[in-house]
Amino acid sequence: MSDSKDRKGKAPEGQSSEKKDGAVNITPQMAESLLENNPALRNETAGMDKDKAAEAMRKMNIAELLTGLSVSGKNQKDMASYKFWQTQPVPRFDETSTDTGGPIKIIDPEKVSKEPDALLEGFEWATLDLTNETELQELWDLLTYHYVEDDNAMFRFRYSQSFLHWALMSPGWKKEWHVGVRATKSRKLVASICGVPTEINVRNQKLKVVEINFLCIHKKLRSKRLTPVLIKEITRRCYLNGIYQAIYTAGVVLPTPVSSCRYYHRPLDWLKLYEVGFSPLPAGSTKARQITKNHLPSTTSTPGLRPMEPKDIDTVHDLLQRYLSRFALNQAFTREEVDHWLVHKPETVKEQVVWAYVVEDPETHKITDFFSFYNLESTVIQNPKHDNVRAAYLYYYATETAFTNNMKALKERLLMLMNDALILAKKAHFDVFNALTLHDNPLFLEQLKFGAGDGQLHFYLYNYRTAPVPGGVNEKNLPDEKRMGGVGIVML
């Protein structure tokens, strides 16, 4: 199953060779493909004619060419060039990391600038007030129409206002970490980058970090090289608040991933996914056969399964923390974060964002398991029959079975729980159920008929060095039970 209709950016085999001086032989086809799928590189060569651009690329090394490359061509974002990342406290591609982690750069708060860098004439910095419905709507508009780089994309994320509230106003959120750029004359919001505070564990080292998200630039300003300026500005604001590390994800290659996971997709409404171009019809199969293959039971099978309630927060918090401690990179949840991220509050939330369920033992009434998923719709662009795809994303889950040290029992339990999650998502009118190869997901993805996507999600740490952790896939990029235990954090 493909994350995009065509596999843009897949490198032609046997056409790349690196010279001894680090430069690369670039064929015209490779140059065109690299520019098409690499917004950062495209902006670096903006204004050059084709020959000059090709010549500039020939002088680059592999690291420079790859920085900012999206192998799937989907949801491309300009994440800045290799030259910029060379100036940042991030691990280099060519360095050898050890398990013993630590900050790359010690920040002296006295030396952090109290003022932001100047923007291009005609633009100014803004701090977004997401408690203000007008400003929330402005951010929604920017993300809705400009979060996808490829003008030919078939799908565009549609973040609801409820989703933005949920994602950006978590416990401890700071208004100054919701950064915008406005056009001075029109006051129009033309760029954003946002962060929320949390704590993570990196190989048992607890770090206060900012989760960075929603880096978005208006399409008409993509050549203005705003990305590095946005990253530097939110970094400055975090430093001023005493936070010197960050975690972020990207579908593009940057220096240097701490882990990489693969997307998997389980059709819930196969026919609709086929009609919008998301799911292909396999050779030799029929529509009827695919619908039958992806059919799900109408009722769940786990005894004691019910929606999570506020009374479950303490028990779920304890279970989740113990479960996540099994992973090298994980989120250190507080009770307040469990409440915020997992409990739907219908009295205050216009549109449901998260669904969470617990398993209460019918005899002991103890909570033995829980799972959750969240809603992220996509707008379908120029399709005569459908205008949206409702996607459920597997979020956090945990089970007491994980502590039995019985892998067979854990696999059986997760197969039951996740099959029920699929059934419940189908009942909630979702069209597809998405998951990554993190947590213990490799134990059930293939058996529950998840199809492999062509997209990767790379995890990055800013100003922190540690050896890479496994992302649940082997050297063939397939789910592998032996490659679990690395990523225990889900980024929106």
Curated annotation (Swiss-Prot):
The keyword Acyltransferase applies. It is an enzyme of class 2 (transferase). Belongs to the NMT family. The keyword Phosphoprotein does not apply. The active site is at residue 492. Residues 1-22 have a biased composition (Basic and acidic residues). Pfam families: NMT, NMT_C. Disulfide bonds: none annotated. It comes from the Eukaryota. This is Glycylpeptide N-tetradecanoyltransferase. PROSITE patterns: NMT_1 (PS00975), NMT_2 (PS00976). The lineage of its organism: Eukaryota, Fungi, Dikarya, Ascomycota, Pezizomycotina.
